[in-house]
């Protein structure tokens, strides 16, 4: 039986496209919030598949959409909003975070890879975690790390992206039964 997969994003959706192509499976539903055009350009591979919600969607708006699915796996890919507690408690939601919060809890929140790079952290990485109502507070279920000694900013972006994609692909293969 096919497991429903729902994704949320607030930025470009590029990560979703790369994961989907690698898995040879697209999400059953792709949700993004309405934002001014100058703040982002959505990956053209997603444009036809996207459902828009308000910039700051209400619990009711989210529940109306999600309730149509039976026990879906929900993944967040650059979703720049805190999920309401009632949604977190009712659904299995996972987030990818580009900061090694298992080692550096101060990297919770937006753009941790930039903070780690500028702070010359010796080890960097990313995690997948269960989503609860707090920002990056849920239980970490997987992590990938890399030596960040003397890397360039470009190398940091590539290493973080590659490790994040690896985590997502391996997690989704198991979770979606692929």
Label every PLM stretch briefly.
Residues 1-178:
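One-carbon transfer enzymes
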């Amino acid at each position: 039986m096919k497991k429903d997969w729902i994704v949320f994003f607030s930025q470009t959706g590029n990560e979703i496209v790369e994961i989907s192509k690698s898995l040879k499976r697209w999400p059953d539903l792709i949700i993004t919030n309405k934002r001014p055009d100058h703040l982002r350009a959505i990956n053209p591979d997603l444009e036809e598949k996207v459902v828009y919600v308000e910039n700051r969607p209400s619990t009711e708006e989210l529940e109306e959409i999600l309730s149509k699915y039976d026990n879906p796996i929900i993944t967040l890919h650059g979703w720049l909003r805190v999920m309401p507690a009632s949604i977190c408690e009712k659904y299995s939601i996972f987030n990818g975070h580009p900061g090694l919060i298992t080692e550096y809890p101060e990297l919770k929140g937006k753009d941790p890879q930039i903070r780690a790079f500028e702070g010359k952290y010796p080890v960097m990485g990313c995690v997948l975690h269960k989503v609860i109502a707090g920002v990056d507070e849920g239980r970490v279920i997987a992590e990938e790390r890399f030596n960040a000694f003397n890397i360039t900013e470009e190398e940091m972006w590539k290493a973080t992206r590659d490790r994040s994609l690896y985590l997502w692909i391996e997690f989704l293969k198991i979770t979606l039964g692929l």
